[in-house]
């Protein structure tokens, strides 16, 4: 049984309002998938960009595989994302027209052991929106504490 890997981009939910989510496959080298299975990846500073009709994840950090030889991968390189043509067209259209952006939300392995990247079509939050979301989190946390105390 394979150990599942979940690497989250916690910053994305704070900085962006997520409109829609998609699950995409990633084109990886052998040493890259081995590093991901060990949990040695980071997607907090990464973003997605179109090059022609293809979508790439840029600035995704996957640590070099410790047992690799001279044919090891680069830690920060563009990685092609695999989506249906219909999904790519709709994403491309919405990014061009509405000023939205595509941000990686979660890097995980599925039940077959393949690496997948959950991406979100997002709109940037303003500073006052971020403050409001912080206030909502604080009030929710306080309510949970009160409920726990009386139960």
UniProtKB/Swiss-Prot annotation:
One CC-aspect GO term: cytosol
GO BP terms: trans-translation
Keywords, alphabetical: Cytoplasm, RNA-binding
Main function: Required for rescue of stalled ribosomes mediated by trans-translation. Binds to transfer-messenger RNA (tmRNA), required for stable association of tmRNA with ribosomes. tmRNA and SmpB together mimic tRNA shape, replacing the anticodon stem-loop with SmpB. tmRNA is encoded by the ssrA gene; the 2 termini fold to resemble tRNA(Ala) and it encodes a 'tag peptide', a short internal open reading frame. During trans-translation Ala-aminoacylated tmRNA acts like a tRNA, entering the A-site of stalled ribosomes, displacing the stalled mRNA.
Gene3D superfamilies noted in UniProt: 2.40.280.10
Family membership: Belongs to the SmpB family.
Gene: smpB
Name of protein: SsrA-binding protein
Pfam families: SmpB
Gene Ontology terms, MF aspect: RNA binding
Subcellular localization: Cytoplasm
The keyword Metal-binding is assigned to this record: no
Keyword RNA-binding among record annotations: yes
Annotated InterPro entries: SmpB, SsrA-bd_prot, SsrA-bd_prot_CS
């Amino acid at each position: 049984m394979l150990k599942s890997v979940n690497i989250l981009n916690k910053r994305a939910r704070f900085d962006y309002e997520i409109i829609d989510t998609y699950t995409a496959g990633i084109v990886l080298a052998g040493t890259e998938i081995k590093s991901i299975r060990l949990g040695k990846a980071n997607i907090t500073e990464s973003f997605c960009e179109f090059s022609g009709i293809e979508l790439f994840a840029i600035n995704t950090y996957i640590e070099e595989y410790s047992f690799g030889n001279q044919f090891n991968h680069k830690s920060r390189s563009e990685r092609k994302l695999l989506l249906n043509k219909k999904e790519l067209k709709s994403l491309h259209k919405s990014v061009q027209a509405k000023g939205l952006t595509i941000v990686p939300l979660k890097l995980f392995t599925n039940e077959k052991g393949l690496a997948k990247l959950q991406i979100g079509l997002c709109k940037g939050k303003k500073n006052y929106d971020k403050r409001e979301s912080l206030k909502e989190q604080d009030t929710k946390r306080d309510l949970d504490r009160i409920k726990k105390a009386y139960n």
